[in-house]
Amino acid sequence: MKIKNSLKALKGRHRDNRVVRRKGRIYILNKTNPRFRARQG
């Protein structure tokens, strides 16, 4: 999982990316291609 300051650019890298908020953190999750996962930090 990548940790990035801004997820806006990462969101558009794959069409299945989803932006999810969990426990105050923002994640990008992708079930079809998990290597696109990221967390804002």
From Swiss-Prot:
One of its GO terms (molecular function) is structural constituent of ribosome. GO terms for biological process: translation. GO terms for cellular component: ribonucleoprotein complex; ribosome. Keywords: Ribonucleoprotein, Ribosomal protein. SUPFAM superfamilies: Ribosomal protein L36. The keyword Ribonucleoprotein applies. InterPro entries: Ribosomal_bL36, Ribosomal_bL36_sp, Ribosomal_L36_bact. Belongs to the bacterial ribosomal protein bL36 family. HAMAP family: Ribosomal_bL36. This is Large ribosomal subunit protein bL36. It comes from Bartonella bacilliformis (strain ATCC 35685 / KC583 / Herrer 020/F12,63). The gene is rpmJ.
